Structure formats: C-alpha cells, structure tokens
From Swiss-Prot:
Glycosylation sites: 176
Origin: domain of life: Eukaryota
Species lineage: Eukaryota, Sar, Stramenopiles, Oomycota, Peronosporales
Family: Belongs to the Necrosis inducing protein (NPP1) family.
GO cellular component terms listed in the entry, alphabetical order: extracellular region
Domain statement: The structure of NLP effectors is remarkably conserved with a high level of conservation of a central region containing the conserved undecapeptide motif AIMYAWYFPKD and heptapeptide motif GHRHDWE.
Organism: Plasmopara viticola
Keywords: Glycoprotein, Secreted, Signal, Virulence
Protein name as annotated: NLP effector protein 9
InterPro entries: NPP1
Motif Conserved undecapeptide motif location, chain numbering: 151-161
Annotated signal sequence range: 1-19
Amino acid sequence: MKISNLLGVLVVFLAVVKGQKKDEGSDDSELLALVTVPDGPVIFSIEQVEQVAAPSTDKHLSKLKPKIAYDKVEPFEMAQPSESTITEKAAIKFRPKLYIANGCHAYPAVNKAGQISKGMKTADPTFATCGKPSKGTQVYGRSAWFGTVWAIMYAWYFPDIPLDWEYAIVWTNNPNVSNPVILGVTVSNSEGSTTSQTPPDPAMVDGRSVKIAYNNKGLESSTTLGGTQNLVMWHQLTVEAQEALNKKASFNGVQVPMNDNHFLRNLEASWPFSKEYLQ
C-alpha cells in the first residue's frame, strides 16, 4: 500500500492559514488547527513534513572535518517545555525510557556544524568504552499525522561496530487534547523488522513513557525502567546536521530512521492498526 493512497493523513505544515509555510514555532494559536484529527484524506510528500531547520552559527564550516570521534560530538540542547510548541511538548511528554541491557549507550550522531560520529575504532565486548557519554545523551524525534493517529518517532544512535540506529514510534490519539493517550508502540528489533503493542502492556509503561530496552542491536518493550535522553526534533536541527543525516554514506550505509529518505516509509512499514484508523 503506497503512502500516497493512505486516507486521512495530515502532516504539520502552515500553508493552511496564510497560503505559505511558516516556522512551526512561530505561534501556537495558528498551530492549534493543525494538530486536530483530520476530517478527510490528505495526499502529501516528505516536503510537507516539518522541514524548517535551525540556523547555523559556524561561519567556517568548510574547514571542519566531516567526521569526528564518537565521544567528541556535542549534543543539541533540548528545548524547555515552556519554549516549545504543542507538538514539541507532546514529543517531550512521551519520551521513552531506554534501558541499556546489552550494548553501547546512545550517543549524539551529529553536531550543529554537521560533523558526524565516526563510531568506535575497535569493538569492545564489555561496552565499557561506550558507556554513558561524557558530553551528554541524545535522542532524535520527528512527528506527523498518519491516518487519524499522531505518530512520534524517536531514534537513537549507537556507536558500536557496526554502527547502529534504532527507533521507536509512539502512536497517540492527538497532541492537542488535555489528556493525550498512547494507542500503541512500535520498536525496531534485532531482526531488522519491527514489533508492536496496541495498546502497550501497562507493565511496560511508566506514566506517559513506554519502557524500552536496547539488547543485541535491537529494541524491545521492557518492564525494566531506563532513562531519558536529551530530545531534539528534526526541525530543530541545523541545516548542516539535517544534510549530514540525509546522506546515505554518513553512517556507512546504515539507515537513519527519521531522515527525509526513511521517515515516512518507516511509519508506513510500522503501521500496527486496522484500517479504521486510516479513515
């Protein structure tokens, strides 16, 4: 089933009010109408999903090395809830709690200048050298309507050998209601596919955070409580960071789940509901 044929799909773009795109963070009052359940089908492409990037601050980017050591990558700061829009607040609210059962901890993959992580030089069976990152953790987010469900993707980068990207999708009813709820959760597993729970097992949820474990290069729903990481949404990344994450060669061909090439495809491939949620 092609994405272009899905019914009821709504993405966050601000052409509705004034006929032109604006930064999502410009005004919550304009955003309100854009995060309610859609009335009918909307045909869209990746160009209509949140595309605004944060401005770069480095004037000497061309002189920088494209790749740096995995433990030298500075993470993006997480916007405080009071400074965030409705969709950003929802992404912060539903951040999964990740427990590292076996493997490296989640590290920043790219910095503001677009320099990406090289990953580890040699494998460490004990994972001691890729434990908790000294410069801070990072989880990457991106969200959109898919059918009548608000999908929030969270993606983590692990600098092990080989490099690894994993993701979780938290499917919610609506970010713009007083009490949004989790309808389901999908995680990428160690077999290269996905596993879903609809709804998630209550024992695997802590408040509004699903509990997830990283184990043997894959994610799985868990009863063990982990921690949260600094969240940066796709549209909060600099242009340089977005471009680096969009390049297929950046991570030796390993898929970056939330980039322009894979975000919508992963939502479609991970869809865990019946057709009623598409109408």
